[in-house]
Design a protein with these regions (language model features):
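Phosphate-binding/catalytic loops
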Residues: 11
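Short, structured patches in soluble enzyme cores that scaffold and shape functional sites
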Residues: 4-8
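Residues at the starts of beta-strands that form the adenosine-phosphate
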Residues: 1
Length: 101
C-alpha cells in the first residue's frame, strides 16, 4: 500500500501538489500496471495529464510564483528534481512519524 500525502495550501488542494503527486502515481502504474487506484490517486493523475506531464506547470502555479518572489527559487528547483534517489520513506500511521529503515 502506498500513500501520497499532499499538504495543500490554506486547507485547500494545491495545483502543484496535485501535479507532482500525479507524476508519482504515473510512475507507480509503470511499475505495477493494473494497480488499483483510489479516487484521490485518479484525481491527481488527471491533474498530471492536464498539465501535459510537465513539472514546469507546477512551477507556474500561483503558490510557486509567490515562493519565488520571497526568495525560495532554489528550493523549488530542488523539489522539482526527478529520479535523484531510490529512497522511499515509510510512515507509521499510529504515530504520524517516519519509520526507521
Amino acid at each position: 500500500r502506498v500513500c501520497i500525502l499532499c499538504c495543500g495550501q490554506e486547507g485547500k488542494p494545491a495545483w502543484e501538489d496535485s501535479i507532482c503527486a500525479g507524476l508519482l502515481v504515473e510512475r507507480l502504474l509503470l511499475l505495477r500496471p493494473g494497480l488499483s487506484l483510489g479516487k484521490g490517486a485518479r484525481t491527481v493523475l488527471e491533474a498530471w495529464c492536464r498539465a501535459g506531464r510537465k513539472l514546469e506547470a507546477a512551477m507556474r502555479s500561483p503558490h510557486a510564483r509567490r515562493l519565488r518572489e520571497i526568495g525560495f527559487s532554489e528550493d523549488l528547483d530542488f523539489c522539482c528534481r526527478v529520479d535523484v534517489t531510490g529512497i522511499v520513506p515509510r510512515y507509521d500511521p499510529s504515530t504520524g512519524l517516519a519509520l526507521d529503515s
